[in-house]
């Protein structure tokens, strides 16, 4: 049973990463539940791509899925986007037009030869208890599909739209941690063995050398037993940290929320 004194009800991948990166930003969003930090244009484009793929893998034909992603992008209000130096109406209009072009190019790269799957679930969400962990885990899986290496099992598929491909590939710690969150939730929801986490990265800008716009990384969970033990340790240690009285400090060097978290600290809004 969850300790009633803990400030949150569960851990998610985004929550844990925010806590490790910027404790004050984490406190604002996941404890106070204030969600007012604007998204970057790149982040909005990526979410539009996810919307398109969600509809495509739900059975809608390509053009219809692309249109629904574009509709999502156009419906995001200006105040939810961090336009940076584009402060005038004309500058923001120009930036939005560039976002639409970037989205249409990126989704065209993905759907030129879309990965084919026997899909069991799209945008699969859940919160589950895990033996040995002090808080439940929450995760959202882009796709849950029949595994091609074991037809009695499932694989988890994740899509990412990126400016550049990941350097550490499948062994990048942030991917491994995300995959374990998804593993536990999907295993509980589908009651089937979970074999792999498959990550498809799509580079949004056209490669000058003509190389492939898509890269595929595969995490076979059978090869990551040590990482599961490390994950459990990290969740327990992070939970211990938030269970004690503490001051939540900002991280001004955080490229995502450094300025905002420092402004909150300056104003003493969490005291």
Predicted feature residues:
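Short amphipathic alpha-helical segments and their helix-coil junctions
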Residues: 1-8, 23-36, 86, 156, ...
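An acidic intrinsically disordered interaction segment
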Residues: 3-21, 135-151
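Nuclease catalytic cores
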Residues: 17-62, 100
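Metal-dependent nuclease catalytic regions and adjoining charged, substrate-binding loops involved
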Residues: 184-271
């Amino acid at each position: 049973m969850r300790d009633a004194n803990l400030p949150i009800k569960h851990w998610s991948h985004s929550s844990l990463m925010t806590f490790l990166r910027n404790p004050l930003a984490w406190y604002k969003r996941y404890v106070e539940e204030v969600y007012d930090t604007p998204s970057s244009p790149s982040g909005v484009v990526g979410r539009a791509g996810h919307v398109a793929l969600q509809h495509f893998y739900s059975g809608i034909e390509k053009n219809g899925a692309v249109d629904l992603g574009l509709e999502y992008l156009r419906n995001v209000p200006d105040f939810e986007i961090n336009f940076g130096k584009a402060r005038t109406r004309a500058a923001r209009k120009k930036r939005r037009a560039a976002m639409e072009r970037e989205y249409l190019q990126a989704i065209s790269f993905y759907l030129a030869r879309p990965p084919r799957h026997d899909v069991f679930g799209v945008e699969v969400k859940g919160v589950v208890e895990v033996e040995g962990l002090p808080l439940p885990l929450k995760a959202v899986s882009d796709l849950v599909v029949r595994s091609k290496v074991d037809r009695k099992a499932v694989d988890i598929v994740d899509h990412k739209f990126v400016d550049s491909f990941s350097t550490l590939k499948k062994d990048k710690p942030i991917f491994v941690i995300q995959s374990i969150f998804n593993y536990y939730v999907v295993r509980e929801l589908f009651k089937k063995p979970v074999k792999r986490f498959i990550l498809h990265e799509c580079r949004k800008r056209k490669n000058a050398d003509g190389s492939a716009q898509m890269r595929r990384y595969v995490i076979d969970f059978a090869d990551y037993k040590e990482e599961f033990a490390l994950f459990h340790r990290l969740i327990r240690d992070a939970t211990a940290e938030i269970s004690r009285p503490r001051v939540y400090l900002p991280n001004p060097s955080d490229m995502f929320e450094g300025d905002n978290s420092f402004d909150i600290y300056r104003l003493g809004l969490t005291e």
